[in-house]
């Protein structure tokens, strides 16, 4: 199995996620000790969802977060450049629709609230018109693109004035003893656990390396601000292991 390097070549990153797609959700739940659900909930709250809002979920993976957004009544486009992830998302949407007694349409499915549509796309060149969405979000994906500033500018472009951005990403624990223990976990325990539960454990070596190289909360906030977003702030989760950054596209009343 191959893994991506920290130069984050798009074809390598996409291939890596294709490899892990089948067991991606299970592996993440194990590696995060179940905290991934809490992080998804916090991201949904940051978006301030409401019925009828148009939401773009970039790096949506298996559309786990997208389905939660749709359950709040939003109409969601789940966008990813890994075709393996989108295939897994399609299966999960079809299963959810079958359980709900509703048929899944081509590329999308009802979720008991809004609707989820799947789209293949690169975060550096989003295939959507300017101002198409009320809310845009990327969870654990910004770290995997070669040019995060370009991705943030693209997210700004497709958001309407006054629309909201939420970025959920691994960050820096705020308490030094936790930070030390966490970095030790990343480099020693995480690869070992991944070997036991993942279909591509080498991919999680990349995960650990990319988290260690990722900037802290304040630096990411400045990058978001430099891309043109306003009212940038963040909320630490799990002591800063993860942070949700929230920002607004200027020009609206929100």
From Swiss-Prot:
The keyword Transferase applies. Its EC number is 2.1.1.163. Gene3D superfamilies: Vaccinia Virus protein VP39. Keywords: Menaquinone biosynthesis, Methyltransferase, S-adenosyl-L-methionine, Transferase. S-adenosyl-L-methionine binds at residues 62, 80, 122-123, 139. One of its GO terms (molecular function) is demethylmenaquinone methyltransferase activity. Belongs to the class I-like SAM-binding methyltransferase superfamily. MenG/UbiE family. This is Demethylmenaquinone methyltransferase. It comes from Parafrankia sp. (strain EAN1pec).
